[in-house]
Amino acid sequence: MKLRRLSLGFYLCVFSLLVVACHVEFSPNAQWRDIPSVYCVLDPEEDTVWVRVQRCYLGDDTLYNYSTIADSTNYPEGSIRVKLLAWEGQRGTHNSLTATNRLVDSWDLVYLELPGKPDGDFASGSQPIYYCVPGHRLLEDTACVFELLVINQRNDTLARATTSLVGFQTLTRVGGDTVESVLVEPNTARGHAFGYRVPNKGEIKWNTLPRGRRYQPTLIFHYAKHGDTMSIPVKGSYLVNTNNDLTLSSKSITQERLLSYVKESLKDNRDTIYIVNMVGIVIDACNEDLHAYLNSQNSASGASQDYQIYSNIEGGVGIFGSRRTHILANVPCDSSGKEGYLASELKKLHVGFSGDWGK
């Protein structure tokens, strides 16, 4: 009996320690409120708009009672509505747009649950998302101001945001196609090729876009292996357009940078490979809202604790911005075999290049 009493006393002692260690002060009637967390990035060359809406907690009391609610981060289906509206924009200085009171179009977004990942890394449950399919009408409405609304069952607006699309350069008709001229150099019309005739310098020059604030060029390097064309994307550093009157922007993707990407990607290759005499140049662009959000995210990932996350969501948090990711040009690659130029330098990497050019 002494042993039993000793054991019981031991368990009571441990239990009391756990109670003290896990003690949480909270009031079941504490004031707390749902704050919508909204993420949407428009791309005028995409036919579908996707919006992620979750909810987060803001209040002065404990999160304990909030965390016990099942699926507390998602709004149940039917509890909110998400709308996208396009308002006619009035042009201002530097291609800025201000919304007028003329509604061009509107869309009620559809609720959809994306399947979750049941196990392994990044396991999660199903993810609710909202979408609409304006089609290529977005392409025609780059002079509009877009408004995003999150509305509850009582028809109250929980969150609201506006943004404008990154615009287009002058569109021209060539045959039956609409052509936009963004890339300036290399100029394929003048027979220019992308390469490193000036050692270590591969310049990309482009026309700035209306409401384009942040740009990132990417070089798509191609090579041939067993008759198939493979690609290695080589990202350049991004450029922020701080001068609204600037009409041209440029950035270099150096030979050194290209070689380092290729060497890392092909370090385990044991086959003979060939250079393809064509490269792709992709230019991504985003507007001021998305640039400010990305910039604040970069600050948050650093060592400093003195930062604020940018949000343009009224009544909530998150981002409603725009980007363009389909600006692509294919240009010839400089096929000079001289010492110090691309072909000879690729061969020196010892990752399988024959030194010959594929087609």
Give a label for each model feature.
Residues 2-11:
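Bacterial N-terminal signal peptides that target proteins for export
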Residues 22-359:
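A sequence/structural signal for flexible, mid-protein segments enriched
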